[in-house]
């Protein structure tokens, strides 16, 4: 599966031709098919947003970031503007303080955490654990496995209640 979106701390972005032109995104890591990125932003005062900024801006709401001309924007229940950020020459308007990620329209909240959160796992979805491209669902993983996964990865995706998605960054000596 090729990644069709970038997971960032501000939300999930669908990859488009103009995405990298509009936003200052740096790729930090991969978790299986998921790209983990960061958007370089500077917070600005909401009162400084001009009408011309609104012609080419993005909205962040409930874990998803969409351009102002997206059909998805109609589904957002936006009642207020919580914060605004500038990235390159584009504005991102945050409409809530929710850090939940909307990943592939799954109806389960996920959050981006450092890999150390793997120690809270009772269920692990592990990509690239033994060989490149493999996938394993592990129930009640051992502490030894959690330790090795935390050393091999920088980030994990978690529901905050014990379900972790992580990349094993397979190498030949991983579980020996």
Curated annotation (Swiss-Prot):
The record ties this protein, via Pfam families, to:
Chordopox_A35R
Q: Does the keyword Signal apply?
A: yes
Name the domain of life: Viruses
Instruction: Please list the GO biological process terms of this entry.
Output: symbiont-mediated suppression of host antigen processing and presentation of peptide antigen via MHC class II
Its keywords, alphabetically, are:
Host endosome, Host-virus interaction, Inhibition of host adaptive immune response by virus, Inhibition of host MHC class II molecule presentation by virus, Signal, Viral immunoevasion
Q: Does the keyword Signal apply?
A: yes
Instruction: Extract the signal peptide range.
Output: 1-14
Listed GO cellular component terms? host cell endosome
Outline the inducing conditions: Expressed in the early phase of the viral replicative cycle.
What compartments host this protein? Answer: Host endosome
The family annotation for this protein states: Belongs to the orthopoxvirus OPG163 family.
The function of this protein is: Mildly affects the expression of MHC class II molecules on the surface of host antigen presenting cells (APCs).
Q: What is this protein called?
A: Protein OPG163
């Amino acid at each position: 599966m090729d990644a069709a979106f970038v997971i960032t701390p501000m939300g999930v972005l669908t990859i488009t031709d103009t995405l990298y032109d509009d936003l200052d995104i740096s790729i930090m890591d991969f978790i299986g098919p998921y790209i983990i990125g960061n958007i370089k932003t500077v917070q600005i005062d909401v009162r400084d947003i001009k009408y011309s900024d609104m012609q080419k801006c993005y909205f962040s709401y409930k874990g998803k970031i969409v351009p102002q001309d997206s059909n998805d924007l109609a589904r957002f229940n936006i009642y207020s503007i919580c914060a605004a950020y500038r990235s390159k020459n584009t504005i991102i308007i945050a409409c809530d303080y929710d850090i939940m990620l909307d990943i592939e329209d799954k109806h389960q909240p996920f959050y981006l955490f450092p890999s150390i959160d793997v120690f809270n796992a009772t269920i692990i979805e592990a990509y690239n654990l033994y060989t490149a491209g493999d996938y394993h669902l592990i129930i009640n993983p051992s502490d030894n496995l959690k330790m090795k996964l935390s050393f091999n990865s920088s980030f994990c995706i978690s529901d905050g209640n014990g379900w972790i998605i992580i990349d094993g960054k397979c190498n030949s000596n991983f579980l020996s």
